[in-house]
């Protein structure tokens, strides 16, 4: 218990914890203190007593209860708890008392500071209100004094105020009379000094009074003098106006003064427009002089600035002054001004169009668009002043016309660039090859052409996109938001160029002897691949790029991408087919000459393959390499294992030599012809000019079919001796050894070469074939 005594109330304990509280402290106050402590620790009444919630509210041992009795509680603890538990309870109670004491001190200090602050604030407010009350009292006293003085002054000056008012009226009347009597002298002095505006204002101030009192002799004399002076003033103003030496504002001032003096408005209107016409025509002559051939013409931007500041600025001044001076003329006067502006505006527009026409050959649109922007902006002001003249609409039409011409110019530029690329390709293909230095291949030439054309297209799109830039004044016009984007750029420029490119490429497929006859086959192959690339990717790319840059906001019909792709694919197919025909005809020409220029009846026994056959194989190999640079391999049928070992008999491979050779004698030609015709009935029909696919195998197959078909037809027209037949047999075997690997189906080569040998046998009086082993030896040696 000593520890409990040591831990007694501290000096800072709150009143609720001290046993020295007020003597009359009520039980209700104690209950509130206990309730605050319970809320602070978050305990219910039962938990605070260490027993389950919901105790008997009349229990005297409940620490938090309203009927707590400390003596009963202590007796209970002494009876029920051992000494150790009592010591623990004491220690816990001391700890709780100290904690509660600290919390109570904190609460007291915090509330005390707030109370002190509130007290100071209230004291300050009382002092301020006390000063304010004193000031309000002094203000009320001063207002009472002022009111008293004001009443006394009003009472004193009431009679004098009436007299002063009368005297002021008399004084004003005297001043007016003095002004009237001095008016002639004032007008004369103003005219002598050139102060015409002041003189007109004087006359305007006195005219109504003089008109009203003109029946009085004195006023009549003043009016007569003023009329004489006014007439002289009007004459001088007219003279100054007619001289025209001053600028437009001064002339407008003269007209305004003349109108104020009562001069006829119709006559002044005509004279005003006539003088304005002279000044504006002078500006037009200056602009026309800048277009002359002798001095170097200024750039289009400078020309537009001159026209805008000179003619257009002058026209704006004339229109503004006319509408201000002659507003009373009504619709007739407005129409007269509109006709005046239309007549001069048409001449100005003609000069501007002449200058803009000189810019059509240039490739840069930036300067031209800036000039058109300034031209269009400067005509907004007269367009607003002269809505009936339609100057703004005419200016917009000029801008639209120039934009259309620029689109046509860029289309021609793209066509010229494409033709220039083709010329470069021709020169590269025709250039002699330097020993040890490889020239550009077809793939490189194709890449150069494609990139060059694409860069020109992008440059053209960027150039015409300047017409739709947001900072350009005319870009919000309906034409540039709709038709220019869809019909002008997309259809006219891009789609038009694709059509033109396809037409130009197809023109190389003309019949021999015309343009197509001089076209290098490699150029046909390159153009075919270029059109195929356009069909697969480029057309979609450039149209997507165009649609993204030029947001179309109208419903004009446009060409679908699929239509352009189909046209490009058809062009590529025609070019590739023509390439096959040209290359096939080149080889066919060699074979035809080799057959027609040889005496097959007097031919010696064959010892070698003819050189023309070697040339055919070499050219075919070169074509294979050339086509392989641009096209994929393609698909071949499964090849037989003996393709390079097969030899030709006198007849086709379907007929055994031992079976038919003994029966072939000069006495039995009908039997041999019959057998050949029967064999043809069961052979597969060969379509020489079948459609060509976009791969190397299909191209080589078409060329070889044309070549071998030509050889077959030439052989059918010749007569062969025994050794001539054997030479054909050797040549065909040599061709078979090398040509089968180029075609899609090797049976095609076998069939055609069988036909060649069989036809030669039919045209031979003594068809004795060479042994296959000998043929193989000769071909291997060759």
Swiss-Prot record:
**Residues with N-acetylalanine modification:** 2
Give the UniProt subcellular location, in the record's own words. Answer: Golgi apparatus, trans-Golgi network; Recycling endosome
Check the record and name the SUPFAM superfamilies matching this protein: Cullin repeat-like
Keywords tagged on the record: Acetylation, Coiled coil, Disease variant, Endosome, Golgi apparatus, Intellectual disability, Lipid transport, Phosphoprotein, Protein transport, Transport
Phosphoserine, modified sites: 18, 44, 649
Q: What Gene Ontology terms for biological process does this UniProt record contain?
A: autophagy; brain morphogenesis; endocytic recycling; Golgi organization; Golgi vesicle transport; lysosomal transport; protein targeting; protein transport
Q: Which residues form a coiled coil?
A: 116-147, 270-292
Protein's UniProt keywords contain Acetylation:
yes
The cellular component terms of Gene Ontology attached to this UniProt record, alphabetical and capped at eight, are: cytosol; EARP complex; GARP complex; Golgi apparatus; intracellular membrane-bounded organelle; membrane; nucleolus; recycling endosome
Compositionally biased, Low complexity: which spans? 1-19
Q: List the disulfide bonds.
A: none
Positions of the UniProt region annotated as Disordered: 1-37
Instruction: Share what the entry says about its subunit structure, partners included.
Output: Component of the Golgi-associated retrograde protein (GARP) complex, also called VFT (VPS fifty-three) complex, composed of VPS51, VPS52, VPS53 and VPS54. Component of the endosome-associated retrograde protein (EARP) complex, composed of VPS51, VPS52, VPS53 and VPS50/Syndetin. EIPR1 interacts with both EARP and GARP complexes and mediates the recruitment of the GARP complex to the trans-Golgi network. Interacts with STX6 (via N-terminus). Interacts with VPS50 and VPS54 in an EIPR1-independent manner.
In its UniProt record, what illness is this protein linked to?
Pontocerebellar hypoplasia 13: A form of pontocerebellar hypoplasia, a disorder characterized by structural defects of the pons and cerebellum, evident upon brain imaging. PCH13 is an autosomal recessive form characterized by delayed psychomotor development, absent speech, severe intellectual disability and postnatal microcephaly, with brain malformations consisting of cerebellar atrophy and hypoplastic corpus callosum. Additional features, including seizures and visual impairment, are variable.
> What's this protein's family per the entry?
Belongs to the VPS51 family.
Q: What does this protein do?
A: Acts as a component of the GARP complex that is involved in retrograde transport from early and late endosomes to the trans-Golgi network (TGN). The GARP complex is required for the maintenance of protein retrieval from endosomes to the TGN, acid hydrolase sorting, lysosome function, endosomal cholesterol traffic and autophagy. VPS51 participates in retrograde transport of acid hydrolase receptors, likely by promoting tethering and SNARE-dependent fusion of endosome-derived carriers to the TGN. Acts as a component of the EARP complex that is involved in endocytic recycling.
Q: What is this protein called?
A: Vacuolar protein sorting-associated protein 51 homolog
The record lists the lineage as: Eukaryota, Metazoa, Chordata, Craniata, Vertebrata
Gene responsible for this protein: VPS51
């Amino acid at each position: 218990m000593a520890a409990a005594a040591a831990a007694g109330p501290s000096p800072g304990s709150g009143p609720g914890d001290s046993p020295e509280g007020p003597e009359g402290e009520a039980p209700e106050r104690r209950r509130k203190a206990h309730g605050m402590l319970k809320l602070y620790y978050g305990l219910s009444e039962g938990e605070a007593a260490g027993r389950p919630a919901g105790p008997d509210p009349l229990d005297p041992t409940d620490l938090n209860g309203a009927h707590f009795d400390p003596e009963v509680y202590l007796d209970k603890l002494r009876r029920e708890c051992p000494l150790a538990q009592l010591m623990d309870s004491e220690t816990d109670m001391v700890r709780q008392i100290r904690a509660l004491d600290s919390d109570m001190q904190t609460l007291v200090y915090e509330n005390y500071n707030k109370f002190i602050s509130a007290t100071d604030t209230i004291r300050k407010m009382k002092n301020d209100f006390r000063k304010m009350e004193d000031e309000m009292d002094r203000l009320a006293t001063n207002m009472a004094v002022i009111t008293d003085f004001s009443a006394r002054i009003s009472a004193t000056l009431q009679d004098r105020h009436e007299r002063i008012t009368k005297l002021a009226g008399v004084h004003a009347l005297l001043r007016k009379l003095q002004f009237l009597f001095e008016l002639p002298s004032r007008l004369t002095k103003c005219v002598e000094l050139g102060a015409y505006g002041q003189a007109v204002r004087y006359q305007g101030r006195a005219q109504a009074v003089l008109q009203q009192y003109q029946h009085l002799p004195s006023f009549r004399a003043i009016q007569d003098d003023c009329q004489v002076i006014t007439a002289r003033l009007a004459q001088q103003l007219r003279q100054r106006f007619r001289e025209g030496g001053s600028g437009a504002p001064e002339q407008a001032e003269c007209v305004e003064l003349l109108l104020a003096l009562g001069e006829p408005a119709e006559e002044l209107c005509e004279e005003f427009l006539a003088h304005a016409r002279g000044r504006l025509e002078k500006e037009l002559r200056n602009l026309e002089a800048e277009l002359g051939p002798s001095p170097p013409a200024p750039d289009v931007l400078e020309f537009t600035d001159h026209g805008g500041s000179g003619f257009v600025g002058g026209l704006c001044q004339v229109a503004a002054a006319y509408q201000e001076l002659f507003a009373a003329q009504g619709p007739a006067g407005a129409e007269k001004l509109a006709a005046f502006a239309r007549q001069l505006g048409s001449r100005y527009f003609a000069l501007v169009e002449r200058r803009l026409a000189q810019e059509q050959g240039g490739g840069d649109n930036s300067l031209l668009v800036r000039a058109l922007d300034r031209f269009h902006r400067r005509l907004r002001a007269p367009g607003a002043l002269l809505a009936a003249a339609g100057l703004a609409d005419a200016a917009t039409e000029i801008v639209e016309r120039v934009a259309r011409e620029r689109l046509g110019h860029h289309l021609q530029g793209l066509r010229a660039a494409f033709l220039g690329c083709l010329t470069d390709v021709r020169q590269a293909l025709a250039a002699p090859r330097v020993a040890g230095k490889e020239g550009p291949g077809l793939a490189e030439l194709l890449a150069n052409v494609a990139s060059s054309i694409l860069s020109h297209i992008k440059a053209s799109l960027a150039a015409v996109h300047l017409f739709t830039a947001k900072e350009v004044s005319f870009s919000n016009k309906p034409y540039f938001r709709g038709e220019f984007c869809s019909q002008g750029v997309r259809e006219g420029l891009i789609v038009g160029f694709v059509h033109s490119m396809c037409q130009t490429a197809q023109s190389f497929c003309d019949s021999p002897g015309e343009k197509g006859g001089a076209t290098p086959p490699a150029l046909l192959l390159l153009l075919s691949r270029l059109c195929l690339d356009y069909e697969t990717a480029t057309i979609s790319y450039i149209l997507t790029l165009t649609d993204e840059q030029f947001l179309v906001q109208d419903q004009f019909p446009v060409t679908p991408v699929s239509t352009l792709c189909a046209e490009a694919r058809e062009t590529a197919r025609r070019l590739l087919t023509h390439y096959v025909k040209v290359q096939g005809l080149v080889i066919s020409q060699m074979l035809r000459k080799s057959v027609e220029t040889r005496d097959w009846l007097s031919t010696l026994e064959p010892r070698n393959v003819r050189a023309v056959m070697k040339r055919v194989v070499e050219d075919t190999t070169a074509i294979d390499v050339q086509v392989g640079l641009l096209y994929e391999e393609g698909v071949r049928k499964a090849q037989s294992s003996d393709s390079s070992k097969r030899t030709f008999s006198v007849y086709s491979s379907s007929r055994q030599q031992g079976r038919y050779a003994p029966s072939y004698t000069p006495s039995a030609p009908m039997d041999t012809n019959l057998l050949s015709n029967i064999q043809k009935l069961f052979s597969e029909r060969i379509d020489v000019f079948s459609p060509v696919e976009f791969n190397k195998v299909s191209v080589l197959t078409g060329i070889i079919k044309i070549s071998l078909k030509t050889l077959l037809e030439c052989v059918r027209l010749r007569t062969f001796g025994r050794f001539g037949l054997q030479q054909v047999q050797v040549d065909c075997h040599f061709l078979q050894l090398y040509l089968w690997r180029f075609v899609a189906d090797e049976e095609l080569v076998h069939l055609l070469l069988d036909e060649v040998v069989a036809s030669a046998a039919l045209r031979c009086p003594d068809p004795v074939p060479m042994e296959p082993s000998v043929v193989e030896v000769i071909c291997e040696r060759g």
